[in-house]
Amino acid sequence: MVETLESIISFIVVFGALVFFHELGHLLLAKRAGILCREFAIGFGPKVFSFKKNETVYTIRLLPLGGFVRMAGEDPETIELKRGQVVGLLLDESGQVEKIVLNHKDDYPNIRVVEVEEADLEHGMYVTGYTDGERFERFTVKEPAFFVVDRQEIQIAPYHRQFAAKTLGQRTMTILAGPLANFLLSLVVFIIIGLLQGYPVDKPVIGELTPEGAARAAGLKQGDKVIAINGERMETWTEIVNTIRAHPGEPLQFQIERNGKERSVTVTPEAKTVQGETIGLIGVYQPMEKSVLGSIKQGLVETYYWTREIVTGLGQLITGQFQLDMLSGPVGIAVSTGKVAESGIYYLMKWGAILSINLGIVNLLPLPALDGGRLLFFAIEAVRGKPVDRQKEGMVHFIGFALLMLLMLVVTWNDIQKFFL
């Protein structure tokens, strides 16, 4: 029970952080482009916690399965004023409309009640209508202005503040920023690990020793420089490993340098069978170093390596070399995260960085409802010279989202069978 709880907490913290930075990428680029962002949400479903800062409501929702940035023009519930509709207008000192009250008008003693004749809240920013039943007036709507519905304020978004109004480049960068934020996060985490823990180097030096390994028993110490093994000169850590692995159970003569003096040590590798192959092991780890430039280089190497590995895995999945039941969903990832967390904070950080790369790559796939799907429609727009009809695009994304949810259910059921049944 305790282990299950720890797995759940580890998963929520790690996955929540990945989603946070992914959505933060979208948010920052959207705001930079001048898009009105109504909500920044981590999770789906009912709100657990929320606060508003400037134009945006920041929320944490119940189900930690993703997140979203709700941008103006992408709202499912757009408010429109219709002819004959009776609304209340709250005016500022200059006579411009600050708030359009749709109900509970009695809450406002200084309200101007208007029967709407015409309203343009995207371009012209005005409302015309009749006051006192017969007097026709035109009211200018200021920026920012708000609808008030059930005593809740909703900011009115002129067209120039909407997602669709922005250039193709601005929209592309806003969508691309999410996956890019995941790659950047992974790079930063790998660099931090290098700065705190160190990074492996391919030098002929003994690293940390295991308590009961053959190396410690023979008298080797951390920091010993290996000059030669059985008379063969060693230039790298890789050469040392290959030599030890190739001689299970056979005494090896190590020529080492310690404190400026050379000495000879005999070590007999323990024979161990791994995946059907018998290899030699002496219980030593690769040497580690710490430096800013080295950590940055290692971070770039790790980010590239895991990006390549994940892309290769996806290619094998598409070509049928991997089966669907080999995929892991939220349950499988949560279980794996819990196991990794038991190994220590650095292992958990590295696991989180790998998951972040995974999230970035998956979101770049040209599938409906994913960032890659949006980017595909932008590419079509660039070729055609005009955007795809919004309703048609929305339907494609809706169907794609439904299929993704179906896939999620299948993968989750596989996880439950694998780990709990």
Swiss-Prot record:
Domain PDZ, chain residue ranges per copy: 186-271
InterPro entries xrefs: PDZ, PDZ_sf, Pept_M50_Zn, Peptidase_M50
Active site annotation, chain numbering: 23
Pfam families for this protein: PDZ_2, Peptidase_M50
Family matches, as CDD domains: cpPDZ_EcRseP-like, S2P-M50_PDZ_RseP-like
PROSITE patterns membership: PDZ (PS50106), ZINC_PROTEASE (PS00142)
EC number: 3.4.24.-
Location of the protein in the cell: Cell membrane
Cofactor(s) it depends on: Zn(2+)
Top-level EC class as recorded in UniProt: hydrolase
Entry superkingdom: Bacteria
GO cellular component: plasma membrane
Entry's Gene Ontology molecular function annotations: metal ion binding; metalloendopeptidase activity
Any one biological process term the GO annotation gives: proteolysis
TM spans (from-to): 8-28, 175-195, 345-365, 393-413
SMART domains: PDZ
Record keywords: Cell membrane, Hydrolase, Membrane, Metal-binding, Metalloprotease, Protease, Transmembrane, Transmembrane helix, Zinc
Membrane topology field: Multi-pass membrane protein
Main location: membrane
Chain positions recorded as Zn(2+) binding sites: 22, 26
Task performed by this protein: Is responsible for Site-2 cleavage of the RsiW anti-sigma factor. This results, after a third proteolytic step catalyzed by the ClpXP protease, in the release of SigW and the transcription activation of the genes under the control of the sigma-W factor.
Family membership noted in the UniProt record: Belongs to the peptidase M50B family.
Protein name stated in the entry: Zinc metalloprotease RasP
